[in-house]
Regions:
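RNA-contacting regions in translation and RNA-metabolism proteins
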Residues: 1-46, 56-82
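Glycine-centered tight-turn and secondary-structure capping sites
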Residues: 48-52
Length: 82
């Protein structure tokens, strides 16, 4: 488990009314760490935020946490279950 994954999981859980419906999956693709954030359909808007500002902030924090570990991190936010 990476620091970037931990950051995304904690923050996304705090943003939703149902943190137990948040799932984070981490995988490696072509030298990049891909973090997929799955949230329940009704909670996606809270994680994305107005004009995507919350999503952009989550991506920036995940990238910064990954950079500390020498990794390139990409965050994708998805509706539903993994």
């Amino acid at each position: 488990m990476s620091a970037a994954r931990d950051v995304v999981e904690v923050l996304a859980g705090a943003l939703t009314d149902a943190p137990d419906l948040v799932r984070v999956v981490e995988s490696q693709h072509q030298g990049t760490t891909l973090i997929e954030l799955f949230v329940a359909s009704g909670h996606a808007g809270r994680v994305i935020g107005k004009q995507g500002r919350t999503a952009a902030a989550l991506r920036a924090l995940a990238a910064a946490a990954g950079e500390k570990e020498g990794k390139t991190v990409t965050l994708e936010i998805r509706d539903g279950r993994p």
